């Protein structure tokens, strides 16, 4: 098996990273592509009380177990299988279960801090930044956290203004300079996604 192509997709919360990742995923056969969500690599907090766990700043680099993510990407690059963690956002810690992920020709890594860490960044063959208007992102964040993570609208808005927005300015927005490609409006930008898919297919063809 050839070394996998590692594609990093980053951008602010609600920017459309997952949509871009899924659009690329759907353009290939299931047996040749896999998606690794950085959200799965939030640190295990089972040693903390629930009251302490809910205080976690999920928008800070220290919230992630980047060392484990880097280790897993290196293993996938060698053709090995990994056990990806599962994070429970209602309990604010990892589940005991894991998901087995096998090495594929294409590995997409998607998350807000993908380009923030130097070692992680250097593993990536293609680095994508999804750039979306702040108003659109907060609306998406509110809808997602209420529907998928059991949050109230007040708690989401308070978190966005007090934590998410300043963390975006400090840690995420500056990583745009490391991107090979910037995709405005995320999954709505079909032209940019089609260009990306064509480029990936070209690299795959050259590597065979």
UniProtKB/Swiss-Prot annotation:
It is found in: Cytoplasm. Its EC number is 2.7.1.48. Pathway: Pyrimidine metabolism; CTP biosynthesis via salvage pathway; CTP from cytidine: step 1/3; Pyrimidine metabolism; UMP biosynthesis via salvage pathway; UMP from uridine: step 1/1. This is Uridine kinase. PANTHER family: URIDINE KINASE. The keyword Cytoplasm applies. Pfam families: PRK. GO terms for cellular component: cytoplasm. It catalyses: uridine + ATP = UMP + ADP + H(+); cytidine + ATP = CMP + ADP + H(+). The keyword tRNA processing does not apply. One of its GO terms (molecular function) is cytidine kinase activity. The gene is udk. Keywords: ATP-binding, Cytoplasm, Kinase, Nucleotide-binding, Transferase. GO terms for biological process: CTP salvage; UMP salvage. Belongs to the uridine kinase family. Its main location: cytoplasm. It is an enzyme of class 2 (transferase). ATP binds at residues 11-18.
